[in-house]
Amino acid sequence: MKKTRKIVTATVFALYIFLLIHVLFFRYGRSAAAGIDGLSYRLKYAANFVPFKTIRSYAAAMHRIPRVAVLNVIGNLALFAPMGILLPAAVPAMRRPMRTLLFIFVLIVAVECVQLLLGLGSFDVDDIILNFTGCAVCCAIYFSVTSRKNDKA
């Protein structure tokens, strides 16, 4: 039974990673905006380095475009949330909460940087905040549940 659970967990984790890569880099037929000119443009006009700027703009726009605002915030909260459960469940080296959270934080920042450098999406510090928050909540739930199981055993 334990081996079956490991196989299922690893399979679900692999599928999640595949879907995550697709959503982050290949949805909507994205293509890289090449060259330094593209990067300088993205840095100047398409990147947000100010924490909560995008979140505040969505909050301000709730009465005009509620669907876009809600979908963006909830989508960013949910995007990395499964990672908070699947990573420690599938990878024994990630069975410590701080190690898991640090790894995922670095991963999220790296994803945003790749999006900026390649022009596959945009860099937004609020995406980092929301992605990490969703992940941290699920990570806390995972470690809370698994520590209770270990206490009972």
Language model features by range: what are they?
Residues 1-120, 125, 139-153:
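Bulky hydrophobic segments
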